[in-house]
Curated annotation (Swiss-Prot):
<protein>
    <recommendedName>
        <fullName>Urease accessory protein UreG 1</fullName>
    </recommendedName>
</protein>
<comment type="function">
    <text>Facilitates the functional incorporation of the urease nickel metallocenter. This process requires GTP hydrolysis, probably effectuated by UreG.</text>
</comment>
<keyword id="KW-0547">Nucleotide-binding</keyword>
<comment type="subunit">
    <text>Homodimer. UreD, UreF and UreG form a complex that acts as a GTP-hydrolysis-dependent molecular chaperone, activating the urease apoprotein by helping to assemble the nickel containing metallocenter of UreC. The UreE protein probably delivers the nickel.</text>
</comment>
<keyword id="KW-0996">Nickel insertion</keyword>
<dbReference type="InterPro" id="IPR003495">
    <property type="entry name" value="CobW/HypB/UreG_nucleotide-bd"/>
</dbReference>
<keyword id="KW-0963">Cytoplasm</keyword>
<dbReference type="InterPro" id="IPR004400">
    <property type="entry name" value="UreG"/>
</dbReference>
<dbReference type="GO" id="GO:0016151">
    <property type="term" value="F:nickel cation binding"/>
</dbReference>
<keyword id="KW-0143">Chaperone</keyword>
<dbReference type="Pfam" id="PF02492">
    <property type="entry name" value="cobW"/>
</dbReference>
<comment type="similarity">
    <text>Belongs to the SIMIBI class G3E GTPase family. UreG subfamily.</text>
</comment>
<feature type="binding site">
    <location>
        <begin position="24"/>
        <end position="31"/>
    </location>
    <ligand>
        <name>GTP</name>
    </ligand>
</feature>
<dbReference type="InterPro" id="IPR027417">
    <property type="entry name" value="P-loop_NTPase"/>
</dbReference>
<dbReference type="GO" id="GO:0005737">
    <property type="term" value="C:cytoplasm"/>
</dbReference>
<dbReference type="GO" id="GO:0003924">
    <property type="term" value="F:GTPase activity"/>
</dbReference>
<keyword id="KW-0342">GTP-binding</keyword>
Length: 216
């Protein structure tokens, strides 16, 4: 179904790149996930670009540009100036325009990652903006986060539980947290990551590739 929708969209507009959202609370590891994905996607030959969102700065975009991991021109920044979810859900015009501009500058781009500003468990992406989206939480927030549910955690296409290496240091029962996450999501995918060590990054890249790039 998603493949058919992408084909219809490409035929109706000049937009051909798959668009993937990455949301989650402040400090959960959204930018770190992108940094970890960049070399994996490059190694796989994926032509991609990134759009970041911050409230009143371009901090995350500048971090990626300075990283040396990606051509700085392939990173665009949106300053939300309001609640982070406003520009990815209620009115994603700025992000849509940023994605369109990247596609115009890089005609071969096949994937654009949209990182939302840090938000809460209610944050979701408009399907006018993205084709598929990831929500990132981390164990430092407590192993009860999945049981609190929230639209972001429940509706995302992929839930990433990050910083699993910290579980013993913050008193989190990781096995229970992951089991609860899988239960409340009704079988939708959950991937555990330690981005510092690279744990789980290949699995996230595999999920993106299978879902929107149609590569197995």
């Amino acid at each position: 179904m998603l493949h058919a929708l992408r084909q219809a969209k490409a035929q109706a507009t000049a937009t051909v790149a798959a668009r993937v959202g990455i949301g989650g609370p402040v400090g959960s590891g959204k930018t770190a996930l992108i940094e970890a994905l960049i070399p994996v996607l490059q190694r796989r030959g994926v032509d991609f670009a990134v759009v970041t969102n911050d409230l009143v700065t371009k901090e995350d975009a500048e971090r990626l540009r300075r990283s040396g991991l990606i051509d700085p021109d392939r990173v665009s920044a949106v300053e939300a100036g309001a609640c982070p979810h406003t520009v990815i859900r209620e009115d994603p015009t700025l992000n849509i325009a940023a994605g369109d501009e990247l596609e115009a500058r890089f005609p071969g781009v096949e994937l654009i990652l949209f990182e939302s500003g840090g938000d809460n468990l209610a944050s979701t992406f408009s399907l006018d903006l993205v084709d598929w989206w990831i929500f990132v939480i981390d164990v430092a927030g407590g192993d009860d986060i999945p049981r609190k549910r929230g639209p972001g955690l429940l509706r995302c296409d992929l839930l990433v539980v990050n910083k699993i290496d910290l579980a013993p240091h913050v008193g989190v029962d990781l096995d229970r947290m992951l089991a609860d996450a899988r239960q409340v999501r009704g079988g939708k995918p959950v991937i555990a990551t330690n981005l510092k060590a690279g744990t789980g990054v290949e699995a996230v890249a595999d999920a993106i590739s299978a879902a929107v790039l149609f590569r197995i």
